């Protein structure tokens, strides 16, 4: 599917059990933030067009908690996942600066 985000869009941390997902940047820039089970960030994948030197295509093949932060005014991705998504996603509270 094609997804277009506007800066300020809120994508809460979530994961997809039994699913893989891949993202391909069409335009704009965004970060994929991965979290551990306690809600602490473990990795940030900065995505952008090839000329930007950032990651163009990202694939996640495990049920890892993740969120998206839009870095440009707009960003569009082609997202591919296997199967249908459940109506309700798992969510985790994000821990900021060591506070819960």
Please give the residue ranges for each predicted region.
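A short glycine-rich, His/Asp/Glu-containing loop-to-beta-strand
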Residues: 1-13, 19
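Conserved hydrophobic/aromatic beta-strand scaffold that supports enzyme active sites
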Residues: 2-4, 22, 57-59
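Residue-level recognition of short, solvent-exposed, well-ordered loop/turn junctions
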Residues: 6, 51-53, 61
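Short beta-strand His + acidic residue motifs that chelate non-heme Fe in jelly-roll/DSBH
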Residues: 12-14, 32-34, 58-60, 66-71, ...
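"Short basic amphipathic alpha-helical interaction patches in structured regions
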Residues: 16-18, 46-47
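Double-stranded beta-helix
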Residues: 37-52, 67-100
């Amino acid at each position: 599917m094609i997804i277009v985000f506007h800066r300020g869009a809120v994508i809460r941390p979530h994961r997809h059990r039994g699913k893989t997902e891949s993202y391909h940047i069409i335009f704009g820039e965004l970060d994929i933030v991965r979290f551990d089970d306690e809600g602490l960030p473990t990795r940030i994948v900065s995505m952008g067009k090839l000329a930007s030197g950032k990651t163009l295509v990202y694939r996640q093949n495990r049920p890892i908690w993740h969120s998206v932060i839009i870095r440009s005014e707009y960003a569009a991705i082609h997202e591919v996942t296997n199967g249908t998504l459940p109506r309700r996603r798992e969510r985790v509270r994000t821990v900021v600066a060591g506070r819960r």
